């Protein structure tokens, strides 16, 4: 039986990123949760955009969550869903925008699944 689902917004609708670079969300504490079930959407981009669902024990060293898709890109004007297993205390989403004159509009939201006792 799955644990209770708690809504989470990692990047608000409609976040616009301008210029090549790495954009990270604020880390959220997820020690009471076992999975992150996230949906991402992006509009057409100038350049390339990839999302990374990452976790950390100390908010300094980050690693890709188990089960997360590396270089996750749902595609232009498309929504994609991914589930990541949570094993560490902190969760964030990192967006990497690349290319000359790069810009993108996107969002990432979903649910955190509570651990069962």
Give the ranges of each region predicted by the language model.
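Surface-exposed ligand/attachment interfaces on beta-rich extracellular proteins
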Residues: 15-30, 44-50, 74-81, 99-103
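Aromatic/hydrophobic beta-strand junction motif of beta-rich domains
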Residues: 40-42
């Amino acid at each position: 039986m799955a644990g209770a689902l708690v809504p989470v917004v990692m990047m608000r609708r409609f976040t616009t990123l301008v210029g090549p670079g790495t954009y990270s969300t604020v880390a959220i504490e997820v020690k009471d949760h076992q999975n992150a079930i996230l949906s991402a959407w992006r509009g057409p981009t100038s350049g390339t955009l990839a999302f990374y669902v990452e976790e950390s024990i100390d908010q300094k060293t980050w690693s890709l969550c188990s089960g997360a898709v590396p270089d996750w890109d749902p595609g232009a004007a498309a929504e994609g869903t991914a589930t990541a297993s949570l094993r560490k205390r902190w969760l964030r989403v990192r967006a990497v925008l690349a290319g000359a004159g790069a810009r993108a509009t996107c969002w990432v939201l979903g649910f955190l699944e509570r651990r069962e006792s």
